[in-house]
Amino acid sequence: MIFDYFDGAFYLNLNSRTDRREQFEMRTKHFGFNIERFPAFQFNKEDVKCPWGDDRWYIKISCTQSHINMVKEAKNRGWKNCLIFEDDCVFTEDYLSNMEKCVGDLKNVEWDLFYMGGEPNDYCTPITENIYKTKGVYGTHAYAINHTFYDRILNVNSECGVIDTIYLSWYIDDKKYIIAKELLVLQDDESISDLWGQHKKSVEIYKNAYKKWMI
């Protein structure tokens, strides 16, 4: 199995979003995946002040803290790497075959983060036929983190920002980010996003970004 390369896997889910839990577990069951649920952390709104008046800021940095908590748990368990999913992740039908190719290539390169999809923000250059080097990606609904990057994220203050922009913020020479050539995952556009308070409609954004930046 492709997951044999990874020491563990979590999917992030708020206790209040039982709908997303059911949908995600139904999707993983379809592929025969066994992914551990990780309860999302939630700050109290009154404890978090956003300097530019974003009423949903406490939710966004709660997501950041949740990702930090997953990385901390992976390190505590002694995992050399960890798959991280968010509960609105949707696997493409050819996920298994394409992911297997990517994993085969990952074994032979140095990497810190591996994105299974998302919105690249700059040109991505090929490493192999299956994986590309990227400067960063918007979206953290499906990625893997290597032990080489654990301490980097564990030293971050969650109030610095949204998790995907934090990953983007490191200088290119200080990170080894890899992205799948093919979109392996999307997000459920029919599910209301807690971070944004609306249907995000990200599928077309991701597809268009891939067309633009994957050379």
Indicate residue ranges for each PLM-predicted region.
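An acidic/histidine-cluster motif and surrounding catalytic segment
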Residues: 1-85, 89-215
